[in-house]
Amino acid sequence: MNNRCPCLHVSLVSSVMGRGIVRTIKRLPNKKFPLIAGHKLQYSCNLKCKMCPFWRREDEELLGIDQEIRMMESLKRAGVSFLGFEGGEPLLRKDIGEILHQSKKRFHTSMVTNGWLLKAKLDEIKDSLNYIFVSLDGIGEVHDRLRGMAGSFRHAVEGIEAARDYIPLAISSTVTNENMDQAQGIVDLAVKLGVSVNFQIAYDYTTAEKMSPEKMQLRETIKLLESYKIAGLPIVNSKEYFSSVLNSWYGNDPWKCKPWLTINIDPLGNIVQPCYVLNEYNGNTKVWDTDILKLWNTYDWTPYESCNKCALACYLEPSLFNWHNPSMVKERILDSMVSLVKGDLSW
């Protein structure tokens, strides 16, 4: 599933998780460590999204539950607090319930789904997720066209209606060159359904259709979404997310990307570096065979700090963590971290 970040919900974490993050920061002063992990369970998907390169790949042998647990333990030792699952379509996995159950015992756990199977699988997963994102890129036929399957919109909405009372839920919407006029409709739908919505900006992968928006048209869409956020509509993105994109892409004030705050693991258990946008999920180092902290603190991240090629929230939002802006911290992270972020975390 392209341009989806399953760990976007860092603003919605409990204070208990916040204390865990603080303990990790204190345990690893002046060290780089991944706070967030994203794991593609498989590439296989029941939809064929235009902007996604991953459903076009053949899955090799997938990790079994013992290997999934081994991966989780490696991530936990490295300081990861959030684990998000994506695909492909995660709900196609027959063992998805057990995988999520094992994850929630160790992490704040989230998942991204296209929603087609959500209603049918709800009982299997509802007690093992802290948050879930359902992809919606337009209203009705617009969504179906982008997703490559008639009925996608209807199934996604039915999934949202079934799950929203059991799992904290948000719509995840990718802004492309074919749906910039859908932003208001998607926000209106989120309000109607009683859920939040997170927006991503499509990035052009080498093996997918070129769907990134034209920059000047995109500017107006971002300004519109920023105004909705300021007006108090249920948008997950921080105000700083929108202002950072505007300042970098249309001004001369790039944000400093910190891709090392997020670690991505492919369906075979390989680490993806420096990020899955530039790497496109081509890993070759097993996570359980790697000293992640040693790798993270010897890898040269400097060339990627000024990248600014994508605006994926799983990279941009964490990169804002040490901004000296208490209101942003209270909105996007945790009250328990305010005192730390007011200072310099030396990240």
Locations of the language-model features?
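Conserved alpha-helical substructure of the radical SAM core
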Residues: N2-E124, S128, W323, E331-R332, ...
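Accessory C-terminal segments flanking Radical SAM cores
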Residues: G38, V195, E220, L233-V338
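Generic structural signal for small/hydrophobic residues in well-ordered secondary structure
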Residues: L41, C45-N46, S103, V134, ...
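Short glycine-enriched, charge-decorated loop/helix-capping segments at active-site entrances
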Residues: W55-L62, R145-G151, S212-E214
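Radical SAM/AdoMet-radical enzyme domain recognition
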Residues: I65-E86, L92-D204
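Short acidic, glycine/proline-rich loop/turn micro-motifs
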Residues: H143-L146, A208-M211, L246-N247
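A structural motif corresponding to the C-terminal lobe/cap of the Radical SAM core domain
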Residues: E158-E161, D188-K192, E209-I235, N282-T285
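Short, catalytically relevant binding-site loops at active-site mouths
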Residues: Y203-T207, Y241-S244
